[in-house]
Amino acid sequence: MAQNIQEKISEIENFNNMKILNILPKNIMIEVTNKCNCKCIFCANRKMKRQRRTIDSNLVNKALTEAKMLKVKEIGFYVNGEPLMDNNLNNYIKKAKELSYEYIYITTNGILAKKELIQKLFETGLNSIKFSINSIERENYKLIHGIDKFDTVMRNLKEVYILKKEKFPDCRVYVSYIKTKYNNYSDRDIKKIFEEICDEVVIQNVKNQGGLISNIEKIKCEENKESITRKLPCFYPFKSIV
């Protein structure tokens, strides 16, 4: 049985199942750009000191080719930026598809995710798209994301999901929701908003992203206190290559 998105995330983030093996992870993630059109209060992107730019296309193609030679099976074209801001994204998906990657995916804030663009990405070979939408109300969305685009994002999500159901039933459309004390709606209310317009909703507590979220104590939910204060290893070296 295929894993749902929550199971895949839980497997990657399982701190109790980390082993040093003489094999590479099956998943790689390529940051095609570190540019972003949001300023989310829980995200380290706005604290980034690196130059804002898109990746060199030759480097992406080289990485995809070499990773496939090493038996990598899954590729995500995002890390800490908005992938739809890179005009070469469709070319990268095409290359990954040509190399027979089994699972190709992105996460987006959804602002630029118009159905015409996503249709093109699905046609090229994108297997799933995850919308990062971290509020269920317009004014609160503006507070969390630092931009007033709630209506735009919700419209894009609805249209992309309809597109998926009508033309791309094997593709998946997900929603992720990061909880802070400023958007701490009940899971029931969150799912009520999204569950009819996507395949699955993933709700997670805010993380400190390697200590880059200096105000984590001010924005975390009270019930999330232990997971924030415990010192845990980064799971990426064990489960993925970034």
Describe each region flagged by the PLM.
Residues M1-S10, E31, R53-I55, Q119-V242:
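Radical SAM enzyme [4Fe-4S]-AdoMet core and its adjacent flexible, acidic
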Residues A2-S128, E139, L143, I147, ...:
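Conserved alpha-helical substructure of the radical SAM core
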